[in-house]
């Protein structure tokens, strides 16, 4: 992948039906347990499953750019011929309110979750670290080094805008976004841990504070691990909690990344990483197909059995842990199932049908990013 430009790529998305006012209202009613909300949500899911193209045409959905895919494409590139253009494209997807958030990135569309409504301009800790990594990569190019460095420093304001949802002498947990939230999201805090580690390494002004916060967050996350090695999505036992593959991989991935930047985190997270990986191997990996399954505990059902996002993130941690042979086997298995005639699909349903043609954000770009890491390791053959 050697592109002078082209990191901006508009595409459709699984969340298309839920981005408009009507979709937001339906999800809100669904999460509140209202009967009409449940019925309406079921109808939308059914239509989206059976007639995804027609539904998007009816809803007048337009493809859009997604901040996370821009960052991941920059990270996947072997060489960037025009890094100043890549930087401009990356920054063009950041949230507009710099006075409040500094440099930060979000989903790029409205999202109604169990925690409430996040508008399209709300930045997320689950997205901003990818852009931070991309900025660190762009710092290596002299032509844009100073600007990329300033933009990276500008993410500190966002980090400090996150709300403290838990803190004691040893541990810390932050919000998913800089708004009031009723529940702590565990994987989001691993992103915060990694982001603070990046600041500890790259931002001398805030080195000590960043390191302290990263360690406290890592201790919190490790403390939330279940005896069997798993992590729930939320740090509570309230209804609606679940354990799925790619969010579990997020936790492990970010602990690995943080461990590579901080020796103290490496020591305190080592066993948790090993136990978390073992849980995925034993409970998500399917020997028959060579793929990883979606859930071990779930709260909402849909028609889909396999998800490319799960394969992408599991592939990433296999590479991070130097399990290159298994990584290449997974890569080949996923390609054989989700890719046909060089066209990628995001999901596979219980009928064996591929769904989500070229939905870049959902699994496709993350998989390409993980593949690029395998290629750079010299262990994978396309």
Where are these regions (language model features)?
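Contiguous N-terminal and early-domain "leader" segments and peripheral loops that mark the onset or edge
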Residues: 1-32, 57-80, 129-132, 193
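Structural helix-adjacent loops and short alpha-helical linkers that scaffold large soluble proteins
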Residues: 1-5, 9-12, 78-88, 136-154, ...
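Glycine- and aromatic-rich loop/turn segments at beta-sheet edges
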Residues: 13-31, 37-61, 93-119, 158-183, ...
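Well-ordered alpha-helical segments within folded domains of soluble proteins
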Residues: 64-79, 120-139, 183-201, 240-260, ...
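Long, hydrophobic, well-ordered secondary-structure blocks that form the structural core
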Residues: 128, 137, 146-171
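Loop-centered beta-sheet repeat module
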Residues: 179-202, 207-232
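A beta-strand-loop signature enriched in Asp, Gly, Thr, and Trp
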Residues: 251, 257, 262-315
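Short hairpin/turn module used for nucleic-acid contact or packing/dimerization
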Residues: 332-382
